[in-house]
């Protein structure tokens, strides 16, 4: 779990850049509000979770910063910033749909009852709660609404993000480890 959390925490800055782009390029006030609330949760609850988890697992600041990014982590940081730089709402939504949709799908399949250790249990509840479920449904509806106008761009970002997700999990959880 340490390798996963270290690498996952590394793209929070790029993720916030992507959320900022979604706020800036969304075509409705309601969408901007939803993204703003979600960005607030990432900056508070989720970032605080990472810091508490690192402390509980004995992960020092040096252990968080010294290992190089895995290739998929570097790729994720790059694709989030690339999608943001397009100034395309559809591109931002494509990346967000893959990332957040996979978190929700994973969390919904997590074993019940919850693990006793907060490091595992809270990571699940951050990604399986009514607000997060509603946010992922919102992302899907927004991509369905605006994606067709930029279908090639949205599809390109979506497919590349799916490939990065698979590579990310293969890198942090190699077979046999």
Language model: regions and residue ranges:
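Short basic/hydrophobic patches in alpha-helices and adjacent helix-turn junctions
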Residues: 109, 125-129, 141-148, 167, ...
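Long amphipathic all-alpha helical oligomerization modules
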Residues: 130-159
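Alpha-helical bundle segments that constitute or directly flank the non-heme di-iron/ferroxidase center
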Residues: 1-25, 44-45, 94-104, 169
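Active-site-proximal alpha-helical scaffolds that flank and shape metal-associated catalytic sites
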Residues: 6, 30-131, 159, 163
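Surface-exposed helix-capping loop/turn segments at secondary-structure junctions
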Residues: 21, 25, 29, 59, ...
């Amino acid at each position: 779990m340490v390798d996963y959390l270290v690498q996952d925490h590394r793209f929070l800055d790029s993720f916030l850049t992507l959320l900022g782009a979604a706020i800036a390029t969304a075509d409705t006030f309601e969408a901007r509000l939803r993204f703003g609330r979600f960005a607030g949760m990432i900056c508070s609850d989720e970032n605080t979770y990472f810091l508490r988890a690192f402390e509980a697992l004995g992960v020092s600041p040096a252990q968080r910063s010294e290992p190089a990014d895995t290739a998929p982590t570097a790729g994720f940081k790059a694709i989030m910033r690339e999608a943001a730089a397009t100034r395309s709402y559809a591109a931002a939504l494509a990346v967000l749909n893959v990332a957040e949709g996979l978190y929700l799908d994973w969390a919904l399949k997590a074993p019940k009852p919850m693990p006793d250790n907060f490091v595992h249990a809270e990571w699940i509840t951050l990604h399986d709660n009514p607000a997060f479920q509603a946010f992922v449904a919102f992302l899907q509806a927004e991509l369905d609404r605006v994606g067709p106008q930029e279908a090639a761009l949205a599809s390109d970002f979506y497919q590349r993000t799916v490939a990065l997700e698979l590579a990310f999990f293969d890198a942090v959880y190699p077979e046999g480890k």
